[in-house]
């Protein structure tokens, strides 16, 4: 055996731990024939001369081990044990297969003869059955069954599908690594050395390991289906060359390092072991571990072979050409060889080593060139946004998922993290299955203190656990508003809700929905509970609701959109329309509990005090009934008295301003004129806040809104006319259904679509006026936009029947047939088949006499180029604006008599009617036609007005069409996600304002039947009509004309509130009203919540919340025309509102209801 440092017995270049002296001294001690000193010297001298030759034959020994005194090498015995075991077993398996094959061939012919004989014997039987098998066959069957049972048992023992199997597999792998570690320790010893089994601790451990390997090998052999292939497996070969040498080592009392390095091949199974332990779950991690384990095991195994041959030498050279290399030097040599660097400091000297290196370079280089780059790529591409969220103590977090893009995230963060929200202590965790691009990543980095991103899917419970969804304050799901298939997008978001609710049913979810009819599917989720904060923001419902309200009060869509969006105040010194518009844009909607100083006061009184004293505009309160169910009452009137713990809804520019309503104290603040000085005083009633009354916040979160304070406000109604009296009920025809079952909307029996279709000539003969024209682009394949959401607010029951504006749809009849199922229960709806681009169709519906023209498109999402998504709407808008008309409105107005409120004389300037929409004397050009156009792409707003100077990069809310209320984009609804999270009643308030009275109960009914159900007029349903509505108050004439010319807005606010219970909240002003020279421009813009001292002009229109008028049950307008006189009368009068006169309520004629019914019957056919 070659020793270290060039000797024959050393291994690894170091001296043996089991030698008492150096090899030369051991050789001298074994020479028993030399006893004299001279002979000893001669012998020593002789041995020194021949040391290189004799050293190769010497085996290092110790005095305690009775080893071969001649130093004979026994490596061949260890190798022979492995070879005999391998080839012997292989020979036995092949011999068994050969004998089995011959037996099968020999018995095949005999089997055919016996089978034919059995068939013949069986056919000769009378009953036709075969004879039973003989006893020998039964014995064979029993033996086969016993063998199969043993085989199945062995298979179960080693299968990873059972706990025992997994334990065995893991244990075998662990012991294999242990045996490899022992090899690493022994590699510092000589390749072959004498050892005593009873005194060598490492040999005993190695022996125990290999006994276990032998037992496991037996189990694998029994369980193997194909013994031959099992015998040739890598793991079997490893056992052949590592297990038998250990037993030989015990027998010979010597050790040979040999092929024990093959245990490194067990590392290939490392990924399987980690999968058994449920550590590796992703494909990338499994692939990475596979590549690493194959690379490392091949590397260590090859290093072990080089270590063996280089320290031993070539056999045909009598082991004289060996060199002392440690195992780790061989590992280094193999690495520089695989990488083709080859420094030359370490190299192979033996022929076997060099021959192995030749073949290893070919395979190793290929493996290095393919495996290493792939490993680096997998490590580099590991989920940068993996890991788990670590919750911060005392800080809430929300999870945002769904449609995560640069646009959606930037819009969300802009509103959620707005500086006006001074109480935001919420961390935002985004979860998406696609890693962010560079722009989105940069956005996250800019908000790194409050934003974190994790890559994953909410459909995966493991990812939900990573973001701590169970401890999250809420989960927000964003929708792709520009997707080609809205129903598919809604289905995806519904699945996300199902997955999240299945993981944690109590989590609060706020999701965006595109289609109104898909909201019904959310009600099927058992844990979905809107009372606990779950909300679905339907973009189609709100978008069309906003547009519908603009049909009643032009510009309202812009005002409402700005109210729930967080906008910073932009100060402009120049006296331009932008100055006043931006001052109103900075106002938002806030909530705050009212001070106890307001207890016992009526709503108008508190509203006036807040506006005059606190500089706050309160528009609604939260009312909780006796059964603790909350309702939001918008401008409820003077019959309601404020109680302790009432929650108010305010329009203000800052959250700090709203706190004045909570801090106000009559004793301390009554004489204060500067509202900024109203702060928390030292009164005991403010210091001793009730625990149930939540801390004042501008955006009260879930529990504060849904859970009632200590006491609830009670409705104290003193007006008997709020609910119809017995005389009214007697005059009602209980068999006529005029309203739906909830009493919130006007209703009629379902009509066939053919009955409402007008030809162009019929439409021209019907002199329509004061109506709403809806230009709709769509075809048979377009996605439905839900026109019901546009019609419902225009059919709210707080309008009298004669006040309803007739709705005329102009568009493809194929598309409208698909929408008609949801529209056939609404009265005063007509359809003109055609196209909005046809001027003939537009003239047929008298578009120049309409109160509003709405332009919608259902084909917006089928175009890849976003700039072309709005091409149809833009073309239609420009087409209408370029039309010219005759001065025909004067003829119509000469035959019409506007509606005069009871007790008012139209001839008196002070008693002029309050108009809903102020009409121009005549419309001769399409530019003056009121139009609202829906846009998908915000940047396309620049094409609507050719005379504006808006920059293409200007934000939508700063553009002139949006400020004037002539354009609306669904993107403005993104702010509702943040607003709803901070205050879930904000969404309820917005929906109450824009949908005309849609409630969760009504949604459940529509989900059940997909249509409104008619109901009889009962006191309960008629009471639902008593709710305020939005209108526009004209200052050109009427009871407020004196304030229109230079008066203060605050005086108008107080007068309207005291006299008519009307709540003013904005101005719709001509764009050039601030100019000293008259202008022909008829464009108007929105001013939200102007200050008290704001100066009015006569042409202003005032946005107001008007009370329901019980005295306006009959239309007094009549408009004669050729064939549809009653229909046209209703159209013209639909644009006229009245102020309720409390002095004349008691003098209402009892026959009013009967006249109402007659008129209803006349127009029912429409």
Curated annotation (Swiss-Prot):
Membrane-side (Cytoplasmic) residue stretches: 96-166, 224-227, 274-288, 377-1166
Span list, region Segment S7: 544-564
Residue positions, PTM Phosphothreonine: 139, 693, 900
Protein name per the record: Calcium-activated potassium channel subunit alpha-1
Ranges lying in the membrane without crossing it: 324-346
Originating species: Bos taurus
Membrane topology summary: Multi-pass membrane protein
The keyword Membrane appears for this protein: yes
Region (Heme-binding motif): 665-669
Sequence ranges of Low complexity compositional bias: 33-48, 1116-1141
Keywords recorded for this protein, A-Z: Calcium, Cell membrane, Ion channel, Ion transport, Lipoprotein, Magnesium, Membrane, Metal-binding, Palmitate, Phosphoprotein, Potassium, Potassium channel, Potassium transport, Transmembrane, Transmembrane helix, Transport, Voltage-gated channel
Domain notes: The S0 segment is essential for the modulation by the accessory beta subunits KCNMB1, KCNMB2, KCNMB3 and KCNMB4. The S4 segment, which is characterized by a series of positively charged amino acids at every third position, is part of the voltage-sensor.
Activity regulation info: Ethanol and carbon monoxide-bound heme increase channel activation. Heme inhibits channel activation. Phosphorylation of Thr-139 leads to inhibition of channel activity by ethanol.
Effect caused by changing residue 139 to V: Loss of phosphorylation by CaMK2 and, therefore, inhibition of channel activity in response to ethanol
């Amino acid at each position: 055996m070659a020793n270290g440092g060039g000797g024959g017995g050393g291994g690894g270049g170091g001296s043996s731990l089991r030698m008492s002296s150096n090899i030369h001294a051991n050789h001298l001690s074994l020479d028993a024939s030399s006893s004299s000193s001279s002979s000893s010297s001669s012998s020593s001298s002789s041995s020194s001369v021949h040391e290189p030759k004799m050293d190769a034959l010497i085996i290092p020994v110790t005095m305690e081990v009775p080893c071969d005194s001649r130093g004979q090498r026994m490596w061949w015995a260890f190798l022979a044990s492995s070879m005999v075991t391998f080839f012997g077993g292989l020979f036995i398996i092949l011999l068994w297969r050969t004998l089995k094959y011959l037996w099968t061939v020999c018995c095949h012919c005999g089997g055919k003869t016996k089978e034919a004989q059995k068939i013949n014997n069986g056919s000769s039987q009378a009953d036709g059955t075969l004879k039973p098998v003989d006893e020998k066959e039964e014995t064979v069957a029993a033996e086969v069954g016993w063998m199969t049972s043993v085989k199945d048992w062995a298979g179960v023992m080693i299968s990873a599908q059972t706990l025992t199997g997994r334990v065995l597999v893991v244990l075998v792998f662990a012991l294999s690594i242990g045996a490899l570690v022992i090899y690493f320790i022994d590699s510092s010893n000589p390749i072959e050395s004498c050892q005593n089994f009873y005194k060598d601790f490492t040999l005993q451990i190695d022996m125990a390991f290999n006994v276990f390997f032998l037992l496991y090998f037996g189990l694998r052999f029994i369980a193997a289906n194909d013994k031959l292939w099992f015998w040739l497996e890598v793991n079997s070969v490893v056992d052949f060359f590592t297990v038998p040498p250990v037993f030989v080592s015990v027998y010979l009392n010597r050790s040979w390092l040999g092929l024990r390095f093959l245990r490194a091949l067990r590392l290939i199974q490392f990924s399987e072991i980690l999968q058994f332990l449920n550590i590796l779950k992703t494909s990338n991690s499994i692939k990475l571990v596979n590549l690493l384990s194959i690379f490392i095991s091949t590397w260590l195994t090859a290093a072990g072979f080089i270590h063996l041959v280089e320290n031993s030498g070539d056999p045909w050279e009598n082991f004289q050409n060996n060199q002392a290399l440690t195992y780790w030097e061989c590992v280094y040599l193999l690495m520089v060889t695989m990488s083709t660097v080859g420094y030359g400091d370490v190299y192979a000297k033996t022929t076997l080593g060099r021959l192995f290196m030749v073949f290893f370079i070919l395979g190793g280089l290929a493996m290095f060139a393919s495996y290493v780059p792939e490993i680096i790529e997998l490590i580099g591409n590991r989920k940068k946004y993996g890991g788990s969220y670590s919750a911060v103590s005392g800080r809430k977090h929300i999870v945002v998922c769904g449609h995560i893009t640069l646009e959606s995230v930037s819009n969300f963060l802009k509103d959620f993290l707005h500086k006006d929200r001074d109480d935001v202590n919420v961390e935002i965790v985004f979860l998406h299955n696609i890693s962010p691009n560079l722009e989105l990543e940069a956005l996250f980095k800019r908000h790194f203190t409050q934003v974190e991103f994790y890559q994953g899917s909410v459909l995966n419970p493991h990812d939900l656990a990573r973001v701590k969804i169970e401890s999250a304050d809420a989960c927000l799901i964003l929708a792709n508003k520009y997707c080609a298939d809205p129903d598919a997008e809604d289905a995806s978001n519904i699945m996300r809700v199902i997955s999240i609710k299945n993981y944690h049913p109590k989590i609060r979810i706020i999701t965006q929905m595109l289609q109104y009819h898909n909201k019904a599917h959310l009600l099927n989720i058992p844990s979905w509970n809107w009372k606990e904060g779950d909300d679905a923001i339907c973009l189609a419902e709100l978008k069309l609701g906003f547009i519908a309200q603009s049909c009643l009060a032009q510009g309202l869509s812009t005002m409402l959109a700005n109210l729930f969006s967080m906008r910073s105040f932009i100060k402009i010194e120049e006296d331009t329309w932008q100055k006043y518009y931006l001052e109103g844009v900075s106002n938002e909607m806030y909530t705050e509990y009212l001070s106890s100083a307001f207890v016992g006061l009526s709503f108008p009184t508190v509203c006036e005090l807040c506006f005059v004293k606190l500089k706050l505009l309160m528009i609604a309160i939260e009312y909780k009934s006796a059964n603790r169910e909350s309702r939001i009452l918008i401008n409820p009137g003077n019959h309601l008295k404020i109680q302790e713990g009432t929650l108010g809804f305010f329009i203000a520019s800052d959250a700090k301003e709203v706190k004045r309503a909570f801090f106000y104290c009559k004793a301390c603040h009554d004489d204060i004129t500067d509202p900024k000085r109203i702060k928390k005083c030292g009164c005991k009633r403010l210091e001793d806040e009730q625990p149930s009354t939540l801390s004042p916040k501008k955006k009260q979160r879930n529990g504060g809104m849904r859970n009632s304070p200590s006491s609830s406000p009670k409705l104290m109604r003193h007006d008997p006319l709020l609910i119809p009296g017995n005389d009214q009920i007697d005059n009602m025809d209980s068999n006529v259904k005029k309203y739906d079952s909830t009493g919130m909307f006007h209703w009629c029996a379902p009509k066939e679509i053919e009955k409402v279709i007008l030809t162009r000539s019929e439409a021209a003969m019907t002199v329509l006026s004061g109506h709403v024209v809806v230009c709709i682009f769509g075809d048979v394949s377009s996605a439905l936009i839900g026109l019901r959401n546009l019609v419902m607010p225009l059919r709210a029951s707080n309008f009298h029947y004669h006040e309803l504006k007739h709705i005329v749809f102009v568009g493809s009849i194929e598309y409208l047939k698909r929408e008609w199922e949801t529209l056939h229960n609404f009265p005063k709806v007509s359809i003109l088949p055609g196209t909005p681009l046809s001027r003939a169709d537009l003239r047929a519906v008298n578009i120049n006499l309409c109160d509003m023209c709405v332009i919608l498109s259902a084909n917006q999402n089928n175009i890849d180029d976003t700039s072309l998504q709005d091409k149809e709407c833009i073309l239609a808008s420009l087409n209408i604006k370029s039309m010219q008309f005759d001065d025909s409105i004067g003829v119509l107005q000469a035959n019409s008599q506007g509606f005069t409120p009871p007790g008012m004389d139209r001839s008196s300037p002070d008693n002029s009617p309050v108009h809903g929409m102020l009409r121009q004397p005549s419309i001769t050009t399409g530019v003056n036609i009121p139009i609202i156009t829906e846009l998908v792409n915000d940047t396309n707003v620049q094409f609507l007005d050719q005379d504006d100077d808006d920059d293409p990069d200007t934000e939508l809310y700063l553009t002139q069409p949006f400020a004037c209320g002539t354009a609306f984009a669904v993107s403005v609804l993104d702010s509702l996600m943040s607003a709803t999270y901070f205050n879930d009643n904000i969404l309820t308030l917005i929906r109450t304002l824009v949908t005309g009275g849609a409630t969760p109960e009504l949604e459940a009914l529509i989900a059940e039947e997909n249509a409104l159900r008619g109901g009889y007029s009962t006191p309960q349903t008629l009471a639902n009509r008593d709710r305020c509505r939005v209108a526009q108050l004209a200052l050109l004439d009427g009871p407020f004309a004196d304030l229109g010319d230079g008066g203060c807005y605050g005086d108008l606010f107080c007068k309207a509130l005291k006299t008519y219970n009307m709540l003013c909240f904005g101005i719709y002003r001509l764009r050039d009203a601030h100019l000293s020279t008259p202008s022909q421009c008829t464009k108007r813009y929105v001013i939200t919540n102007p200050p008290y001292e704001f100066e009015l002009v006569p042409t202003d229109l005032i946005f107001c919340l008007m009370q329901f008028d019980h005295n306006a049950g009959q239309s007094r307008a009549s408009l004669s025309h050729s064939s549809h006189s009653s229909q046209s009368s209703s159209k013209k009068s639909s644009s006229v509102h009245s102020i309720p006169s409390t002095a004349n309520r008691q003098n209402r004629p009892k026959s009013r209801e009967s006249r109402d019914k007659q008129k209803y019957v006349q127009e029912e056919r429409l």
